[in-house]
Amino acid sequence: MYATDKAAIRNPFIRSELAKPGYDKAEETVSVEVINPTTGSVKCVVAGEITGENIRFSKEISLFCGETREIVFTPEEFPQLKIDNPRLWWPLFKGKPDLYELKMTVSVKGQVSDSLKTRFGIREITSDQNTPDKSRQFYVNGKKIFIRGTNWIPEGMLRHSDERTYAELRYTKQSGVNLVRMWGGGIAESDYFFQLCDEMGLLVWQEFWLTGDTKHPHDQALYLANLESTVKRLRNHPSLAYYVSSNESTEVVGAKDLIMKLDGTRGYQMQSECDGVHDGSPYKQVNPMQHYENTASPRGSRVDGFNPEYGAPTLPTLETLREVMDEKDLWPINKEVWDYHDGGGFHLMSTMYKDLVNNYGTSQSIEEFAKKGQLVGAMNSKTIWEVWNYNKLDYGDRYCSGLLFWYHNCPVRQVCARMWDWSLEPTASLYHTQNALEPLHAQFDYLKNMVSVCNDYYRSFKNYKVKADVYDLNSKKVFSYSQRIDIGEDEVLNDLFKIDFPSDITPVHFIRLGLSDEKGKEVASTFYWRSNAAYEGKEILTGPTSSGFESLNDMPTARLQTKYKTKEVDGRYYIEVSLKNTSSRIAFFTQLQFLDKAGKPVRPSFYTDNFFSLLPGETKQVLIDTSVDKVTEGEFSLTVGGWNVQQKKYKL
């Protein structure tokens, strides 16, 4: 219930029309609903302003008692709504997500009766099926965009908070993902969620509360009323890119017409697997080598076209596992309990995932198993994203227009995490996804032993150098090669050169790829661990991503020098960490942890990188931050350790 004055305004909408082909002129059409809640007629003035742009417009209108009328301001009637050289809104890595603000008032007899404000972005998002395989291709401001997206699942009990929303979306942006699909079995998220997506440059694919395993609502009028209010609430957000009625179902009669009536500026399809979007999979653990040969799905080729659901699990960290179940069920692994926390064993965490972990050597404790489990999760994520990088648009073996990772966030405590778990504790998958999706990226193909470079920027780079170095288990360099490249806007340079591994190389070894600019400054790097194990096909867990890693346990010890300082700025607590590998050995899979007085991770905390490796003499800066209200009482500490680095604890 709310009170109004003599006139009220609701549901503003700003439509942008951009001039082609330059996108250098915008025409804005503004509409708003004006309400007369009184029992008599009202004469009022409706006024608007695009703040900071010296754009103002107004109309005088009369409303009879109880009337609600949509008032429209067009650029033909108000030329000031024509904007030269508008600041366009762009998704992540494509440009700045610039935003404007619209303020509106309704006044009666010179007194403001009601007011509102909303932010909006000037951009155009379209899609078509003008592709070799008729898959759906998206465009932003006239440019093709390769969708590297994900599927958003709401918290299991809908226990949302601004803190949780901020953390999950900040992790999302950090990962490099550019689109979030609001899965049809979920909800329409909060205004704050969309506000953050606007600011972070994250596109949103919005579905409307129907899945393939549910019936249509009994009260369809109520459903359509909810649909109407949701579209009106969300349509000014530039991040909102696409409407889909359902997940693997059909639309409620009238849904499409209603959506197009309320907002004809975005595309629409009936359900998630039609109109150039094929059915998904894989969902569970497979041999990571299968991603390269495109055999990961039992449904056939799925690294092609637009795939709405393609993913793999990750084991949570040790600290989270101990919050999921009792110690007695953690180790030895109680298959019944683990399967219960894995959707009935759906992701194969107690079977195939465990077998992959054991290929790093049989574990003697849950601590050892959890540590090795992060390697498997990191390999899962990195191989998937890099295979899709390789096949981006028409640069690879087949046309690929987009991937939506299944799934993104954990709705409940479970043993099948993703980039982070329900407790908001990141796994190694976040940081290895972040590396795979960096906008300028050199990558290695485990099946072909080839090196490629991907550019996700809308600009080109000339006279860059890509370099590959291979080190054996004792950190001896056994291969090195570099090549100068020019890479075009949004381009992929595939199979630039092959790495020839020496026949006598240690069974496990490491690859470091570096990308340097024309001045010799390194702008990107990637680190891999690889075994000599031959890949014997998808039916068994073999291959250089998947088996033969036992000798990693014999890796010589490395030493890290750690320096740090703390500060508080604008309500955030920061730890600036400087690391240097002072030994002659590679420091493999180094992990930093910010812990409270009980030795538990401070959550949510944000690390610029983690689970990384450092060459002898290499340095790295890591910034950790959290809200200051997380560090008000007690002692806190920073731990630094790694696969072959003894963990050290530093009091903060």
Region annotations inferred by a language model:
Residues 1-180, 188, 394-400, 425, ...:
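Secreted/periplasmic carbohydrate-active enzymes, especially glycoside hydrolases
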Residues 6-15, 111-242, 339-378:
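Active-site-adjacent substrate/metal-binding segments within catalytic domains
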Residues 105-107, 192, 196-202, 233, ...:
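Alpha-helical structural signal in soluble globular domains
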Residues 114, 228-336:
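Active-site region of glycoside hydrolase catalytic domains
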Residues 186-188, 210-212, 248-249, 274, ...:
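Active-site-proximal loop/turn and secondary-structure-junction residues that shape catalytic pockets
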Residues 201-203, 266-267, 304, 402:
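Proline-centered loop/turn at the N-terminus of a beta-strand
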Residues 295-469:
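Substrate-binding clefts and catalytic carboxylate motifs of secreted carbohydrate-active enzymes
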